[in-house]
């Protein structure tokens, strides 16, 4: 199976999580970090889901899944403890051409959750195509050690420098040369030296 790696803009897009237990809550939390409009469907929910609903950060429908829950959804995650319920969610999504991820069931996934290293605006995603989530987690741990928190600050700095370069009247070649320079290992070393307290 060949997968297409992609980062999605989910801001204000309806994303439905079916199930309201710990796994579903973790999926909902990730969607909220992406500013999605999150709807959680499940008769019982974790305290976190209930708290987020009370604070207006997500919508919780305290009942079983119904096919019309996916109306106008951009994507759906099925994270119930019932394989029959997850299958019903998957079939409804397929019928309405809505992207679906059934947790721990690669055959019923239009997309997979990668293991992600987050350092501010820097995101490094690792996927094994559903073959070995444990390996993806191990690689994430290794990358977390390699790319410390300072990388987030450096990426923000590089982004600001890029804006300044784009405002200048430069040829494409000059612009590319400067971009390569500010994103080089030497640039990182200089950035780290400059940010150290005297």
Name each model-derived stretch.
Residues 1-53:
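Hydrophobic, well-ordered beta-alpha structural blocks that scaffold small-molecule cofactor pockets
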Residues 22-23, 83-84, 130:
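Residue-level detector of alpha-helix initiation sites
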Residues 42, 60-64, 104:
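Short loop/edge segments at beta-strand edges and connector loops
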Residues 51-71:
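Glycine-rich, highly charged phosphate/nucleotide-binding loops
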Residues 75-80, 86-113:
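ADP-ribose/adenylate-binding Rossmann-like module
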Residues 102-152:
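E1/E1-like adenylate-forming module used to activate ubiquitin-like modifiers
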Residues 130-198:
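An accessory alpha-helical subdomain
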